[in-house]
């Protein structure tokens, strides 16, 4: 059961059709009220419940604005209790702040078993999933994925995304090994030096990109 609080059911269906993710066992609802979400749970009796996102679901039993600390705490607590009683796997999608922490109450990280962070640069197809917390295994694992027109696909060897192939060595380039969690990655570093007159460029500058 997939509960979307940010997009309508028709919008989510269009995305699912584009990446060929329609399945007869997948139930979809667009709700922002906790009571309506519980009603769908009672009707569908799912094995997996996805809430997208926790900040968009509100409860009449709690005060405060939608997405606020009080609302997020109440909604998350109620859903976790229901899922534990009915043996349902719960996946909460949440927003993060600019510093990378989970938006809303910090207690969300303490009441869940696993925290996965999905990140990537705006102009790159590469996406990383980092395990911030994992009660069932290592918390320094990193998964690499390619964001394509057909969806998000796993990348077993992401070296090709960070390096370019040359028949002969190219001046100004080198390949280094960087460690993302416990996963070593090969990355290519390219250096470009430009010589100019002081009146044209002013003081020398060092600029990095990537």
Regions found by a protein language model. Give the residues of each.
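Short glycine-/polar-rich loops that comprise or flank the Walker A/P-loop
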Residues: 24, 87-88, 110-114, 127, ...
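Conserved inter-motif catalytic segment of the P-loop NTP-binding fold
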Residues: 1-81
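Conserved nucleotide-binding/hydrolysis micro-motifs of P-loop NTPases
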Residues: 6-10, 18-21, 32-36, 54-57, ...
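Short regulatory helix/loop adjacent to the ATP-binding pocket of P-loop NTPases
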Residues: 16-17, 101-111
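Substrate-engagement module of ASCE P-loop NTPases
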Residues: 70-91, 95, 111-122
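Conserved P-loop NTPase
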Residues: 42-49, 55-57, 120-209
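Conserved phosphate/pyrophosphate-binding and hydrolysis machinery centered on Walker-type P-loop NTPases
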Residues: 2-6, 31, 47, 65, ...
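Residue-level signature of catalytic and energy-coupling elements of molecular machines
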Residues: 12, 52, 79, 94, ...
């Amino acid at each position: 059961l997939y509960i979307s609080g940010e997009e309508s059911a028709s919008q989510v269906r269009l995305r699912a059709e584009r990446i060929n993710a329609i399945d007869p066992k997948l139930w979809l609802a667009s709700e922002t009220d906790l009571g309506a979400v519980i009603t769908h749970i009672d009707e569908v009796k799912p094995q997996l419940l996805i809430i997208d996102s926790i900040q968009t679901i509100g409860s009449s039993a709690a005060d405060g604005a939608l997405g606020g600390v009080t609302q997020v705490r109440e909604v998350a607590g109620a859903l976790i209790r229901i899922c534990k009683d009915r043996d349902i796997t719960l996946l909460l999608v949440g927003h993060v702040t600019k510093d990378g922490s989970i938006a809303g109450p910090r207690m969300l990280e303490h009441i869940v078993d696993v925290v996965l962070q999905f990140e990537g640069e705006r102009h790159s197809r590469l996406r990383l999933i980092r395990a911030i917390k994992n009660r069932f295994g290592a918390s320094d694992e990193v998964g690499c994925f390619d964001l394509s027109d057909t969806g998000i696909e796993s990348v077993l060897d992401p070296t090709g995304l960070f390096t370019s192939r040359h028949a002969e060595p190219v001046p100004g380039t080198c390949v280094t090994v960087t460690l993302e969690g416990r996963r070593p990655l090969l990355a290519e570093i390219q250096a470009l030096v430009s010589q100019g007159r002081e009146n044209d460029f002013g003081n020398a500058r060092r600029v990095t990109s990537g």
